[in-house]
Amino acid sequence: MQSLPDTRQQSFDEIYGPPENFLEIEVRNPRTHGIGRHMYTDYEIVCRTNIPAFKLRQSTVRRRYSDFEYFRDILERESARVTIPPLPGKVFTNRFSDDVIEGRRAGLEKFLKIVVGHPLLQTGSKVLAAFVQDPNWDRNAW
């Protein structure tokens, strides 16, 4: 028996409402802290989602590049079947210039968008939701 296509009109909410499952991620607002050899830059991660594996519908946390390195290593160990994309490369000169910081911010955002967009990681990773949502995320707990 063949089923007929659904010909009813969609409501305004169905057309323009939030998608069934969505996850938006943004890396923004880099801030440089400290002086001299103790300087570092961290980045704000904004996450909006309705995926049940994530405890919060909206969250904002700050992470350093070194946190992203640990996070990526944990993902690789945790998810052997998934190829984890590379992070933007390390920078050794002018690493606190606006251009370098903006390039790194864009690279970290691209990395996170790929990672959070992967269905196996969205539902199977133990570290993903914590990294993008928990302000007290501890790299040593993994």
From Swiss-Prot:
As for subcellular location, the record says:
Cytoplasm; Golgi apparatus membrane; Prevacuolar compartment membrane
Q: Which PROSITE patterns match?
A: PX
The UniProt record lists the PX domain at: 21-138
The terms describing its cellular component in GO are:
early endosome membrane; Golgi membrane; retromer complex
**SUPFAM superfamilies per record:** PX domain
Q: Name one GO molecular function term.
A: phosphatidylinositol-3-phosphate binding
Which parts of the chain span the membrane according to its record? none
Q: Which CDD domains match?
A: PX_Grd19
> Is Membrane a UniProt keyword of this protein?
yes
Q: Where does a 1,2-diacyl-sn-glycero-3-phospho-(1D-myo-inositol-3-phosphate) bind?
A: 64, 66, 90, 95, 104
Kindly indicate whether the keyword tRNA processing belongs to this entry. no
The record ties this protein, via InterPro entries, to: PX_dom, PX_dom_sf, PX_Grd19_PX, Sorting_Nexin
Q: Which UniProt keywords apply?
A: Cytoplasm, Golgi apparatus, Lipid-binding, Membrane, Protein transport, Transport
In the record, biological process GO terms are: endocytic recycling; late endosome to Golgi transport; protein transport
Q: Which domain of life is it from?
A: Eukaryota
Membrane topology annotation: Peripheral membrane protein
Quoted from the entry, the domain comment is:
The PX domain binds phosphatidylinositol 3-phosphate which is necessary for peripheral membrane localization.
The job of this chain, per UniProt, is described as: Required for retention of late Golgi membrane proteins. Component of the retrieval machinery that functions by direct interaction with the cytosolic tails of certain TGN membrane proteins during the sorting/budding process at the prevacuolar compartment. Binds phosphatidylinositol 3-phosphate (PtdIns(P3)).
Q: Which family does it belong to?
A: Belongs to the sorting nexin family.
Name of the protein described by the UniProt record: Sorting nexin-3
Gene that this sequence comes from? snx-3
